Amino acid sequence: MFSSNKAPNHRLRITAGPRYDPQTHQLVHVNGPSPIRIRSPYLTADIWVRIKEYTGYPEGSPSSNPYFTHPTTSANRYSITLSLAFAEDVNGDDLLFGNDFDHPIRDYLPPGFNAAFKVVKTMLDPSIDGDAYSDTPYLYSPALASWNQFRVGELVPPDTKKAAVEADPVVLEGAEGSGKAVRESCGLPADAAARTKYFRDEETRKGFVLEKGRVYEADFGNPYLDFEEFAVHVPGITLNISKYVSEKNNVLRYVLKNRTTGEEYLVIGFTVVLDGAQEKTDDGDEVD
């Protein structure tokens, strides 16, 4: 949401937690091999964030990650990778992923925003929906139709903790173990692009259930959002929005939530720390 003209007082800090409340968040070590783990009554999640040409917090973070050399993911400029195990069944149509805000942003939207959104809706993600001009703006997509890669894993036995995950994974479309039968029984296409198109249909999403205790992996990213330059590059349009960043308008949230109940499962905050602002250094390994 944010061509090379990066303002010197802009640095990123990425945090993640189970709720909107930033007090529940922990610092994400961007481009690091290990995830942060988040537990809540709703799920257990492991989260990795990768960003090309990263210069943000914490100090000493790698500027890149091997993820960006993989043939499938090399075009992306950033990535949010998730490994999820839900505490209860979740209907596929209820699972939303996207951005929202707790304050109006209409006065901060740069010229060209509507044209850029039309390009996104028409060419990149037809399933996206939202209202950027409301008092509580949002842009959500059905998660199953918007994630670049989606992998169905094993079922974790009851009363068994979600196992530790491998370091620095690149999640690719497919399945592990008993997850292969799940994909086959649901008729999920093997190709990632075909799967996103498959799940654009509401009834198809309603017919898919993310099972309690089963591990699901997802990867989301794109080449359009440039956090180094604080610009959006969609086909035919570039929006440089660094000048719209302020102390009151400096957080881009990615949210995984339930459409029906409104419950948030995960909140990942991309915060622009302005020059002179105090940097938080919470290094916790896990948040409940």
Residue ranges and their predicted role:
Residues F2-A167:
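N-terminal onset of structured domains
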Residues P71, K243-V245:
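Sterically constrained small-residue positions within well-ordered secondary structures
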Residues V251, R259-D288:
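Short beta-strand elements
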